[in-house]
A protein has these predicted regions:
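Conserved N-terminal segment of class I S-adenosyl-L-methionine
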Residues: 1-134, 138, 149-151
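A short His-aromatic
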Residues: 139, 143
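A short, conserved alpha-helix within the catalytic core of class I
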Residues: 144-154
Length: 156
């Protein structure tokens, strides 16, 4: 018995490595998952992704306040090693920063120039046309629908 509908067979490529060989993996309740035999990623069928509106509303529930001391301590685990490697004359992009970026605020406090991009909260795509000395994607990658496309965008 095939547990995957004909609609599910429309999954044509792996969202991570872009292989054209995704295979049905498992169905859990109504959610259908796929696997890639090349990179071994497991991914949810696009048919089950949240709508853009629901995704936006979900992100509004995140409590990553740039002034919250506990969250700043958490973010400093990324910031501190970067501060050791970067010159203050460098410019960075905080990609997928959300509505309030503690990381960007902390970089600015240390004298860095940071540009914000987020498809929901800072959607000005023209900032993606510039070159940056560094790019951060803190707590972001797991939200990418098509990671390969996002990383290619950042690499161009």
């Amino acid at each position: 018995m095939n547990i995957f509908s004909n609609e599910e067979k429309k999954v044509k490529s792996c969202p991570v490595c872009l292989s054209l060989q995704p295979k049905p993996f498992i169905k859990i309740q109504a959610l259908q998952y796929w696997t890639c035999p090349i990179c071994e990623v497991k991914f949810l069928s696009p048919n089950h992704w949240l709508s853009k509106k629901d995704e936006y509303e979900f992100y509004l529930t995140h409590e990553n306040d740039a002034d919250n001391l506990g969250y700043r301590k958490f973010v400093s685990k990324l910031l501190e090693p970067l501060l050791e490697k970067l010159s203050k004359k460098t410019a960075g992009l905080d990609y997928g920063c959300g509505p309030s970026s503690a990381l960007a605020k902390m970089f600015v406090e240390h004298g860095f120039k940071i540009t914000l991009y987020d498809p929901f909260f800072y959607p000005a795509k023209d900032v993606l046309n510039f070159k940056y000395d560094f790019i951060t994607c803190s707590e972001v990658v797991e939200h990418f629908h098509y990671p390969a496309k996002e990383f290619n965008k950042l690499n161009s």
